[in-house]
From Swiss-Prot:
GO terms for molecular function: chorismate synthase activity; FMN binding. It holds the Pfam family Chorismate_synt. Belongs to the chorismate synthase family. Homotetramer. It is an enzyme of class 4 (lyase). This is Chorismate synthase. GO terms for cellular component: cytosol. Pathway: Metabolic intermediate biosynthesis; chorismate biosynthesis; chorismate from D-erythrose 4-phosphate and phosphoenolpyruvate: step 7/7. Reduced FMN (FMNH(2)).
Length: 370
């Protein structure tokens, strides 16, 4: 199986399966000399880990990260950093009924057709369990970006099923299990999820991710544009069915006089471009939206086929998230960080000495909405 590595200079290769002994990532290309301990990584893993509320999977995994290499006396050495997370709460017997059948909406059928073998236990390699090492690697990337440029990467849920979650304040996000930036709507979201769980069904979500204090100039046109690589990384996240940068699909309805963000000496008037023009960062906030589909594993019986092609009915008994989008925010943050750090190193390699006389304008003109 190929396709397990993200990045060009700062690379992340993940390994493991949902019900194997461990999962992990090898981070290569991290610059030497950065302070790094497990504690720098654990915070983001704790935000993503299962079993943190009644609204997510009840699989109890501590997700304690171990740094096996690439760090000496508390500093990165420039050699590959191996991050290991041991699986401790597998319940493979829950999947005995799908050994010979394919779950609708899952990778069961496609993995079988492509490889001729599949690990049916919790989805194996295709499980969202494999996002844990992505988050661990992303924490390393976040730390480097923060120390080099003051870059801050944050995310929140803006929609749960049919319920819009209006943005109020960033301070609300860590205070609820939905990563909602609006505390007032949390009771409604909890009632909604309780009803969904009783019905044995699932729902999708929309996630917003914002990177602030991003340097100007990141991105490699034409085919390694920054927005193209962001979309590529985000589409590698389980259950993502759509990615928008900036105004996204709303751009279709806008006139050019509205969409084109005007430049002034005091800053940009608007950010419909989402912080990227011509595939290169402008220094404005990079804004990304993700559409996440409903969880395919539900208790409701579904029609399918078995390996022989015969009709079959599939019921899923494992422990699953009624909405995988609830835990997706820290994963999306990690992916954005990984793309940005890779492009920061690529920019430094080719254009680090480039100087122009034109001053860099502020990301936002005074009086413009944030």
């Amino acid at each position: 199986m190929s396709g397990n590595t993200l990045g060009l200079l700062f690379t992340v290769t993940t390994f493991g399966e949902s019900h194997g002994p461990a999962i992990g990532a090898v981070v290569d290309g991290c610059p030497p000399g950065m302070d790094l301990t497990e504690a720098d990584i654990q915070g983001d893993l704790d935000r993503r880990k299962p079993g943190t509320s009644r609204h997510v999977t009840q699989r109890k995994e501590p997700d304690q990260v171990e740094i096996l290499s690439g760090v000496f006396e508390g500093k990165t050495t420039g050699t590959p950093i191996c991050l290991l997370i041991r699986n401790t709460d597998q319940r493979s017997k829950d999947y005995g009924n799908i050994v010979e059948t394919f779950r609708p909406g899952h990778a069961d059928y496609t993995y079988w057709q492509k490889y001729g073998i599949r690990d049916y236990r919790g989805g194996g390699r295709s499980s969202a369990r494999l996002t844990a090492p992505v988050v661990a690697a992303g924490a390393v990337a976040k730390k480097w970006l923060r120390e080099q440029f003051g870059t801050e990467i944050r995310g929140y849920m803006s929609k749960l099923g049919e319920i819009e979650v209006p943005f109020s304040d960033w301070s609300h996000v860590p205070e609820n299990p939905f990563f909602a930036a609006n505390a007032d709507i949390v009771p409604e979201l909890e009632t909604y999820m309780d009803a969904l769980r009783r019905d044995g069904d699932s729902v999708g979500a929309r996630i917003e991710v914002v990177a602030s204090n991003v340097p100007v100039g990141l991105g490699e046109p034409l085919f390694d544009r920054l927005d193209a690589d962001i979309a590529h990384a985000m589409m590698g996240l389980n259950a993502v069915k759509g990615v928008e940068i900036g105004a996204g699909f709303k751009s279709v309805e806008q006139r050019g006089s509205e969409h084109g963000d005007e430049l002034t000496a005091q800053g940009f008037r608007g950010n419909n471009a989402g912080g990227i023009l011509g595939g290169i960062s402008t220094g404005q906030d990079i804004t990304v939206s993700l559409a996440i589909k409903p969880t395919s594993s539900i208790r409701t019986p579904r029609e399918s086929i078995d390996k022989a092609g015969n009709a079959a009915t599939v019921e899923t008994f494992g422990r699953h998230d009624p909405c995988v989008g609830i835990r997706a925010t820290p994963i999306a943050e990690a992916l954005l960080a990984l793309v940005l750090v890779d492009h920061a190193l690529r920019h430094r390699a080719q254009c680090g000495d480039v100087k122009v006389d034109t001053p860099r304008i502020p990301a936002q003109a005074p009086g413009q909405p944030g």
